[in-house]
């Protein structure tokens, strides 16, 4: 994979950078700027070389239409604050305003192009349509840097097709992500423990499938655990359950046993009569995992499971965690996720290499107040890090070879 140093002298060059600025918004307020901060090392490195930095990114799912609420204006403002400069936002992605703003740039300037997904061609399934659109974007730059790890698992105009039109390389963030995830999947220090949570087994099938041949231990929590408990013959009440995955999960359990992979499931859970919409809905109780009443649902792992998971995680040299242990947005059901985060922090302090997979786990870690340097690596890519762990070839990385 080509990296920044393979691009040579970039002084005065127009460098197109595909970043990942898909940040959560509350109105026009950014509630977690982690992804913007993650892009700063590449932006600063290019500015120091005297490059003209042209940033592009998507926000939300505007489905190829201009949706004013999904403008990158809040991102341009936050970038300006973090860099201590003005970052102009072009009114379009490759049209007259983008061209004018790029033409007015001096060395070291930064410009942000408007949301690439305002253009239907960006996510088109027609390669020719995407390629023609990518050429229009590529005309703005002389070199392409791919630094949006959150989108490398997709073949889209601004991260895949543009790379065919310009000399292309990975930015510092993508390089860091690939190094970290490779360290967990290629000859990892053992024991390798993989902790999976989140709501659906179906989202993680490929990961489980691949890791049953690689990991020493799989720890399963979150909503997906109830399908595993059901496959063991337990009743799960009204908990989240994927009936159509029970046979698959039984197969995984058999394979784990055959491969000598330790499969760790919750031994107790925190239950509630309903999925909590507000504080009034909460009447939690802790029961054994094989004693969930018919009219209650599991919403977090219980205290015994928290200790069990903690001990298994700390007894590892490499840990990968993807997906929360419960409904962490509600404080009553956040204890399991907190316990796993704390276990990773403890494992890191004891010398283990730890990765927090992107998406919900990364948000949970930040929202629950854990220090970012408590973990070896917090990934910025949810789907991308999962597909990397599945052993899939990621199109956005392949084009950088």
Swiss-Prot record:
Its EC number is 2.7.2.3. The keyword Ribonucleoprotein does not apply. GO terms for biological process: gluconeogenesis; glycolytic process. Its main location: cytoplasm. It holds the Pfam family PGK. Pathway: Carbohydrate degradation; glycolysis; pyruvate from D-glyceraldehyde 3-phosphate: step 2/5. GO terms for molecular function: ADP binding; ATP binding; phosphoglycerate kinase activity. It catalyses: (2R)-3-phosphoglycerate + ATP = (2R)-3-phospho-glyceroyl phosphate + ADP. Keywords: ATP-binding, Cytoplasm, Glycolysis, Kinase, Nucleotide-binding, Transferase. PANTHER family: PHOSPHOGLYCERATE KINASE (PTHR11406), PHOSPHOGLYCERATE KINASE 1, CHLOROPLASTIC-RELATED (PTHR11406:SF23). Belongs to the phosphoglycerate kinase family. This is Phosphoglycerate kinase.
């Amino acid at each position: 994979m080509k990296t920044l140093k393979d691009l040579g002298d970039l002084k005065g060059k127009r460098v197109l950078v595909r970043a990942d600025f898909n940040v959560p918004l509350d109105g026009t307020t950014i509630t977690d700027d982690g992804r913007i901060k993650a892009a700063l090392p590449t932006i600063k490195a290019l500015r120091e070389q005297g490059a003209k930095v042209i940033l592009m990114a998507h926000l939300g799912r505007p489905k190829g239409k201009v949706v004013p609420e999904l403008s990158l204006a809040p991102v341009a403002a936050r970038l300006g604050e973090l860099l201590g400069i003005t970052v102009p936002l072009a009114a379009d992605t490759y049209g007259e305003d983008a061209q004018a703003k790029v033409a007015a740039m001096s060395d070291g300037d930064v410009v942000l192009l408007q949301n690439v997904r305002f253009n239907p061609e960006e996510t088109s399934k027609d390669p020719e349509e995407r390629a023609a659109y990518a050429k229009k974007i590529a005309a703005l730059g002389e070199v392409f840097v791919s630094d949006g790890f959150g989108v490398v698992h997709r073949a889209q105009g601004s991260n895949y097709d543009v790379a065919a039109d310009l000399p292309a390389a990975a930015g510092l963030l993508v390089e860091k992500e690939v190094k970290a995830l490779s360290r967990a999947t290629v000859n990892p220090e053992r024991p390798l423990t993989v902790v999976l949570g989140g709501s659906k087994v179906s989202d993680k099938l490929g990961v489980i499938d691949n890791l049953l041949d690689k990991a020493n231990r799989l720890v399963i929590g979150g909503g997906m655990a109830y399908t595993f408990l059901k496959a063991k013959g337990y009743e799960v009440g009204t908990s989240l359950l994927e009936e159509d995955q029970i046979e698959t999960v039984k197969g995984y359990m058999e394979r784990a046993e055959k491969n000598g992979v330790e499969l760790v499931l919750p031994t107790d859970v925190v239950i509630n009569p309903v999925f909590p919409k507000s504080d009034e809905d909460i009447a939690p109780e802790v029961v054994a995992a094989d004693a969930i009443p018919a009219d209650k649902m599991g919403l977090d792992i219980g205290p015994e499971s928290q200790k069990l998971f903690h001990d298994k995680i700390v007894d590892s040299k490499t840990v990968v965690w993807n997906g929360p242990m419960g409904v962490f947005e509600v404080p009553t059901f956040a204890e399991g996720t907190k316990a796993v985060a704390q276990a990773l922090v403890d494992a890191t302090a004891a010398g283990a290499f730890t990765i927090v997979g992107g998406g919900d786990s990364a948000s949970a870690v930040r929202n629950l107040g854990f220090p970012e340097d408590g973990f070896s690596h917090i990934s910025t890519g949810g789907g991308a890090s999962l597909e990397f762990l599945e052993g899939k070839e990621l199109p956005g990385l392949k084009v950088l070879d």
